Regions:
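His/Cys-centered metal/cofactor-coordination and adjacent catalytic loops
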Residues: 1-6, 20-46, 55-56, 61, ...
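A generic secondary-structure signal for well-formed alpha-helical elements
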Residues: 17-25, 81, 105-113, 151-152, ...
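Sequence/structural segment immediately N-terminal to covalent heme-attachment motifs in c-type
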Residues: 4-23, 73, 122, 136-162, ...
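Extracytoplasmic electron-transfer domains, predominantly the class I c-type cytochrome c fold
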Residues: 34-108, 169-235, 261-290, 296
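Post-kinase regulatory C-tail/linker adjacent to protein kinase catalytic domains
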Residues: 122, 247-270
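Electrostatic cytochrome c docking/interface patches
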Residues: 1-14, 112-149, 241, 247-250, ...
Length: 298
C-alpha cells in the first residue's frame, strides 16, 4: 500500500475517533480534553510515555510490522492505557486501521521530531523478552523494600506505595497536575498491556522512565538486578485474593471483576462487628470491589 494512502486513511479514522480528545492538530486540546484526567497526549513534541526505548527517546514504531515488544505505539493503541481514558482499540479498528492512524500521527502530528531521522533519533532498545526476571523470593522483596527508600521512590509514591508521598503538586511537562501511581492498584499502571500482574511491565517502567512526567528512568543509577528487586517488591503490593492469587481483571474495564453477590460468612450473635479493617475476622473474608461515585445534581 502506498504510504500516502496509508496516511490518508489514518487521518480519516483519527478525525472520527481521536480528534475529539487529541485535537485536530494533535496538541491534546480537543473539545473533550478538559474532561479527562490525565489529559490526552500532546503529540507535537514526540513525547510518548510507554516505550521499550531509553528515557527521552522516541518509541518503537513500524508502520507495517506490528511485532509484539517491537512496536510500542501499536501496542498502546491495541491495548489502551489502563487508568486513563485511552481505551483498547482492538475489535473497534482493524489491525490495518490502527497502523494507518499511527502512520498519520507519526508523520503529520509529531512535528518537532522525525521517526525517519535515524541520525538524530537514536534508540537504545530494552530487549525485555531476552531478560529473565529474578524470582520474587523473600530476600528479593526485602532488597526491593530497601531500594525504594534508597532511591527516594517513597517521596512520590509514599511509604506504603499508595501514591501519597510528600511530593505535592506534581506537574507533567505541559504544566498539568499528575498523580503518582498507587502500587496497590496495578491494574491502573500505564502500559500494563492488560496484564497488570506481570512484573516485566514494572521493570520496563523503572528502566525507561515515563517521558513527559516526573517519573525518571533508573537505568543509570541502578543495576539490572536492583531493578528486578524493586519490580518484585512493587508487584507484591498489588491487591490479591485472600489466598494470594491475582484478582480477576475485566478486559472491558481493566478493573477487577465485580461479584455482585456478597454472601454472609460471619455471624456474631450478640458480639460487636469489628471496626478495625485489620482485624483477623475481616482478613478471612473474600475481597470485594465495590465501585462508588458521587451524586450528580440536576
Amino acid at each position: 500500500e502506498d504510504s500516502g494512502d496509508r496516511v490518508e486513511g489514518g487521518q480519516r479514522d483519527y478525525f472520527t475517533r481521536c480528534g475529539w480528545w487529541r485535537g485536530v492538530d494533535g496538541a491534546g486540546e480537543g473539545p473533550g480534553a478538559d474532561r479527562l484526567g490525565p489529559r490526552p497526549r500532546h503529540f507535537n513534541q514526540g513525547t510518548f510515555k510507554i516505550r521499550h526505548t531509553a528515557s527521552g527517546e522516541l518509541p518503537l514504531f513500524d508502520a507495517k510490522i506490528p511485532t509484539p515488544g517491537q512496536n510500542d505505539l501499536f501496542e498502546t493503541v491495541t491495548h489502551g492505557l489502563p487508568g486513563s481514558a485511552m481505551p483498547s482499540w482492538e475489535g473497534i479498528l482493524t489491525e490495518e486501521q490502527r497502523l494507518q492512524v499511527l502512520s498519520f500521527v507519526t508523520t503529520q502530528l509529531v512535528k518537532d521530531r522525525k521517526f525517519t531521522d535515524k541520525q538524530s533519533e537514536s534508540q537504545s532498545i530494552l530487549q525485555l523478552g531476552d531478560l529473565k526476571p529474578i524470582p520474587a523470593t523473600e530476600e528479593s522483596l526485602k532488597k526491593g523494600a530497601e531500594l525504594i527508600v534508597e532511591k527516594k521512590c517513597v517521596e512520590c509514591h509514599g511509604a506504603d506505595g499508595r501514591g501519597d508521598g510528600n511530593a505535592f503538586n506534581l506537574k507533567d511537562d505541559w504544566g498539568f497536575s499528575i498523580q503518582p501511581a498507587n502500587w496497590h492498584k496495578c491494574w491502573n499502571f500505564r502500559g500494563s498491556r492488560q496484564d497488570p500482574y506481570n512484573v516485566k511491565n514494572i521493570f520496563r517502567t523503572f528502566s525507561t522512565g515515563v517521558n513527559g512526567t516526573p517519573m525518571p528512568s533508573f537505568a543509570d543509577n541502578t543495576t539490572v538486578e536492583e531493578r528486578w528487586h524493586i519490580a518484585n517488591f512493587v508487584n507484591s503490593l498489588c491487591e490479591r485474593e485472600a489466598d494470594g492469587t491475582p484478582l480477576s481483571i475485566d478486559q472491558l474495564t481493566d478493573k477487577p471483576k465485580v461479584n455482585f453477590v456478597v454472601s454472609s460468612g460471619l455471624v456474631l450473635g450478640n458480639g460487636e462487628i469489628p471496626a478495625d479493617p485489620a482485624n483477623e475476622l475481616w482478613q478471612k473474608r473474600a475481597r470485594r470491589i465495590i465501585a462508588m461515585g458521587g451524586q450528580i445534581p440536576h
